[in-house]
Regions:
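Membrane helical hairpin/interfacial module
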Residues: 20, 24-107
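Alpha-helical transmembrane segments and their helix-start/interface "positive-inside/aromatic belt" motifs
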Residues: 8-9, 43-60, 94-99, 133-144, ...
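Long, contiguous internal "core" modules enriched in hydrophobic/ aromatic residues
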Residues: 15-17, 34, 39-40, 102, ...
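Membrane-interface interhelical loops and short amphipathic "cap" helices
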Residues: 1-11, 40-46, 74-95, 157-178, ...
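Final/C-terminal transmembrane alpha-helix of multipass membrane proteins
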Residues: 324-343
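Short, extreme N-terminal leader segments that mark the start of a protein/domain
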Residues: 3-6, 16-20
Length: 362
């Protein structure tokens, strides 16, 4: 039944990397916007430590590796350049995607440069006449643009499959929605982990304030991740129900996911690792009274214990729950894309369609 499918694991990988890049950039931009963007005084992010720079660089690297995987599958890599130079099929989703990915590379790179303290300092040293205020404006503009392009890339990974046509499991508007939510879920879990590991407190008397800002951002992202996971579960259920009633082939493919050869990938990978475990980890990490999480202190616990000059106040805690949630979310999202690609089987042609095709009749 699945012999029609020529795609292996590599397409699922670059769909995953594109979704991770888009989702992480979108979540990071929202967090930075809610935290005040870049400050005029320091020409840097406010109270978020290394999170803006780290998240921007990870998103850029994920997009670059995903593009490399995509180009590696082309028989002639020059075809990738031809997509941008030819406007003969400008209305296709492939062309839209090609330009969106190029825009993503440019905007993500600018965002990473302007979010990293050393590169900002280098820019000011090279162009002293520009001034810190201009860098702040450019950084906030790049942050906003990166968030918009990130959302477009996350949605495009689903639109690319839907545009194939005549494939029951892909021919639904719920697929782009599902992939977008999956990408945002990944981005939120990775962002929560980065806030734990990279949210260092400011020095001196401002240390407590910076810890409070990091705790607030972490808690907001964790709650957002739980909400996105619940939405993803609902859309996944609607997708499965809708594909069951779409056609006999759609019903067969859905059955293969629920109780057939792809069932372990679906239940263990997409559902358990992709949704249930991250949801449980975030619930434990955010609802625990002392913030003990799963084997380690949370940011809330670190805040209550931190005092200026103490070791606890020098770094934000690193709960194991955030590590488990981020890892499971990425693995589960990869499993989701693998099974969606695997069930991408064309409807069999009828005799009338074969005759029409042989006569060149559309």
């Amino acid at each position: 039944m699945f012999d029609q499918t020529a795609w292996g694991w590599l397409p699922s990988l670059y769909l995953l990397l594109g979704g991770l890049a888009g989702g992480l950039t979108l979540v990071s931009s929202i967090v930075r916007l809610c935290s005040g963007g870049m400050s005029n005084e320091t020409c840097g992010p406010r109270s978020l430590g290394s999170f803006p720079a780290t998240s921007s660089c990870i998103a850029l690297a994920a997009l670059a590796v995903g593009l490399a995987c995509l180009v590696s599958e082309l028989d002639n890599p020059d075809q990738a350049l031809a997509m941008h130079l030819s406007f003969s099929n400008a209305g296709s989703w492939m062309t839209y995607g090609a330009w969106t990915l190029v825009a993503g590379c440019v905007v993500f790179a600018a965002n990473a440069v302007l979010a990293t303290p050393r590169t900002r300092a280098a820019l000011l040293a090279l162009f002293p006449h520009v001034g810190s205020r201009t860098i702040v404006i450019a950084g906030n503009a790049a942050m906003a643009a990166a968030g918009i392009v990130g959302l477009a890339i996350a949605a495009y990974t689903g639109m690319l499959l839907r545009s194939a046509g005549s494939i029951p499991m892909w021919d639904t508007p719920l697929l782009p929605v599902l992939f977008t939510l999956s990408s945002c879920s990944m981005g939120a879990e990775v962002a929560a982990l980065l806030l734990c590991w990279g949210g260092e407190a400011a020095k001196g008397t401002r240390q407590k304030t910076s810890l409070q800002s990091a705790v607030t951002a972490y808690r907001a992202v964790s709650i957002g991740a739980m909400a996105i996971a619940l939405l993803e579960a609902g859309v996944l259920m609607a997708y499965m129900v809708g594909r069951t009633s779409a056609s006999p082939l759609g019903a067969d493919m859905t059955r293969s996911l629920v109780e057939g050869e792809l069932a372990p990938w679906f239940w263990v990978g997409a559902v358990a690792l992709g949704i249930v475990v991250p949801l449980a980890c975030e619930a434990v990490a955010t609802c625990s009274p002392q913030g003990t999480g799963m084997g380690g202190p949370s940011l809330r616990g670190a805040l209550s214990a931190a005092q200026p000059g103490t070791r606890a106040a020098k770094t934000v805690a690193r709960p194991i729950a955030a590590i488990v949630a981020a890892a499971c979310s990425v693995v589960g999202s990869f499993a989701l894309r693998c099974i969606v690609v695997a069930v991408g089987v064309h409807e069999p042609l009828t005799a009338a369609q074969l005759v029409a095709a042989s006569l060149g009749i559309s």
